[in-house]
A protein has these predicted regions:
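Conserved catalytic region of serine esterases and O-acyltransferases that act on ester linkages
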Residues: 86, 93, 103-151
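Mature-region segments of soluble proteins
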Residues: 99-101
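Alpha-helical cap/lid subdomain in secreted, periplasmic
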Residues: 1-96, 108
Length: 151
């Protein structure tokens, strides 16, 4: 099991320690909800994103910090476009499109602004169709998960 009960307990323990340290220095912490493995990775589990969602949401709520729903954005993008390549070939790390989706999700979560219409495309590396699709996914997931209206 990728995220065993023991691993989730350790995550909660160390997240709290780091969050407390950040807060003690008059700063705001946030949790970057990671994405699940790609379905071709040997340790992929069909319910992995649900385990990740529950763990990050619980720790975020317990510590009163923002949870940036990058993992849920990956999941929704794969649901809507199963052939999109968000992961690198190793199946664990984000590729170019996954990194772009994560950046749009971080932007929307931190600033409460919609990423739809942002012009940045990594120096022309992301085509218009993918760019618009990923911006829409980030907008939808962020506004739904955080229960916010993005401007």
């Amino acid at each position: 099991e990728t995220l065993s009960k023991k691993n989730r307990k350790e995550f909660a323990y160390y997240a709290k320690r780091h969050i407390d340290s950040v807060k003690e220095n008059d700063s705001e912490a946030a949790l970057y909800m990671t994405h699940a493995y790609a379905d071709y990775y040997p340790r992929y589990e069909p319910n992995q994103i649900e385990i990740i969602r529950k763990a990050y949401t619980k720790v975020g709520n317990e510590n009163g910090v923002l949870v940036i729903p990058v993992g849920l954005a990956f999941d929704l993008a794969y649901q809507k476009r199963p052939n999109i390549k968000l992961h690198d070939d190793d199946g664990t790390h984000p590729g170019l499109l996954g990194t772009y989706l994560a950046a749009c999700t971080v932007f929307a979560s931190i600033y409460d602004l919609s990423p739809i219409g942002m012009k940045y495309d990594y120096f022309g590396s992301i085509d218009e169709s993918d760019k618009h699709f990923l911006q829409e996914i980030a907008h939808e997931v962020t506004s739904t998960y955080l229960n916010k209206t993005l401007k």
